[in-house]
A protein has these predicted regions:
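Active-site-proximal alpha-helix that buttresses catalytic centers in soluble enzyme cores
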Residues: 2-75
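Generic beta-sheet signal
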Residues: 4, 47, 133-144
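Short active-site segment of divalent metal-dependent hydrolases/proteases
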Residues: 12, 145-146
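Short aromatic-enriched loop/helix-cap "lid" or pocket-rim segments at secondary-structure transitions
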Residues: 16-19, 61, 84-88, 193
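Active-site metal-coordination segments of metallo-dependent hydrolases
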Residues: 18-27, 108-111, 115, 160-161
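Phosphate-handling substructures
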Residues: 66-123, 182-183
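Domain-level recognition of soluble alpha/beta enzyme cores
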Residues: 156-180
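Short, solvent-exposed aromatic-acidic interface loops
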Residues: 182-193
Length: 193
């Protein structure tokens, strides 16, 4: 069985309503440095690292990549939840609306038509379960993707079952088939960016 250290990205330079793929702001870069130190302390030797393809996750992974002299593997299955629109303001309004509901409600939401959210949630979990089945790994991901993993591990059904802070680390365990939550990451009142 492997442990999965799932990290929410650092504070982004812009929110969902301002930029489709922002990097980190100054605080986010500091958070990324701190979480790299934290992970290097927790893990006695380098392990495989995976990152969402989005810039804020790739930049969060960079300090650990430098420290471990490795490169995180881009894993599209741990990217942020897809939205039914590319319009930045409309997608932010959509996200805020669906965040207060359940995964069941999201799957049947008429304004979210065309996206298979059950499949997306399953893809996130499958990536974690298979990549972490026999080895410890680090995964840099997103707020809602972390919630997808949390819900799979705990049986919760809310889209937002917990509020992972920027650069918080949640630890899961994979037996190759399911996820088990070992440690929930730090929560904060945080803006989804």
């Amino acid at each position: 069985m492997g442990k999965i250290y799932m990290v929410r990205h650092g504070k982004a330079a812009a929110g969902w309503d301002q930029d489709a793929d922002p990097g980190l702001d100054v605080m986010g870069h500091s958070q990324a440095e701190a979480v790299a130190q934290n992970l290097a302390t927790r893990l006695t030797s380098p392990v495989a690292a995976y990152t969402s393809p989005l810039l804020r996750c790739r930049e969060t992974a960079m300090p650990l990549e430098i420290m471990w002299q490795t490169q995180a593997i881009v894993e599209p299955r741990v990217a942020e939840i897809p939205s039914p629109t590319q319009d930045l303001v409309a997608r932010t309004e959509w996200l805020r609306r669906v965040m207060v509901g359940s995964w069941t409600e999201l799957s049947s939401d008429p304004k979210s038509a065309g996206i298979d959210f059950e499949r997306w949630q399953s893809d996130v979990v499958t990536a974690l379960v298979t990549l972490g089945a026999s080895q410890d790994i680090v995964v840099f991901s997103h707020f809602i993707a972390l919630n997808a993993a949390f819900c799979a591990a705990t049986g919760a059904n809310q889209v937002v079952a917990f509020r992972p802070d920027n650069c918080s680390v949640s630890v899961f365990e994979s037996n190759g088939e399911t996820l088990k939550l070992l440690k929930q990451g730090h929560e904060a009142k945080t803006q989804v960016n």
